Amino acid sequence: MNKLIPLPREFFARDTNLVSTELIGKVLYFQGTTAIITETESYIGEDDPACHAARGRTKRTDVMFGPAGFSYVYLIYGMYYCLNFVTEDEGFPAATLIRGVYVISHNNVYTIDTAKIKSQITDEKTQSIIIRKNRRIMKFYIPNLKASNLYLNGPGKLCKYLGINTSYNKCDLINNKDFFVSDIGLNLPYYSTTRIGITKGTDKLWRYIVTDPKMLY
């Protein structure tokens, strides 16, 4: 695969729902593992009752107030970590929660041909990607993990697989060679639905999911 280039800060410093939708199909790179983002969720401002910032600016939520393009990682239920990317203009608290990814490489060894995926979506010619066949990603024990062991459908699962915890909170995703988001030209179809795992703001259609994750298998 061509060298991955981090998205600019300007990408994140925009309307959160726009960022959340455009993150679908982008790739998350974390310490040698590359994964296609397949599901996101928006949390926007102090008027969003489900947003952590609805409780005001605290030590925990300070990162949400910007600047954009930083990671916001927190622990829920005392056992699961959640990865978010800070969005919007500095001073306005908002973030996109990364709810699902499809892992395509581990230790920089690719297991699927993303060019083939792209060709299924668009008629444009795509550049070949070198794949080392018969190499599988390391398996980790994650409860309820789907059989593929690659499609991580849940924020806790993806953080556990990648090894993301609160030590990676407030990481700059722009000036970083080990932890960032990149665009490889995938424009995956998606749909919007209500957010889950919350008790307030459940009417917002701010959750975005790849229409058919099986296109990545």
Curated annotation (Swiss-Prot):
Keywords: DNA damage, DNA repair, Hydrolase. The keyword DNA repair applies. Residues 105-145 form the RPE2 insert domain. GO terms for biological process: base-excision repair. One of its GO terms (molecular function) is alkylbase DNA N-glycosylase activity. It is an enzyme of class 3 (hydrolase). NCBIfam families: 3mg (TIGR00567), PRK00802.1-4 (NF002004). This is Putative 3-methyladenine DNA glycosylase.
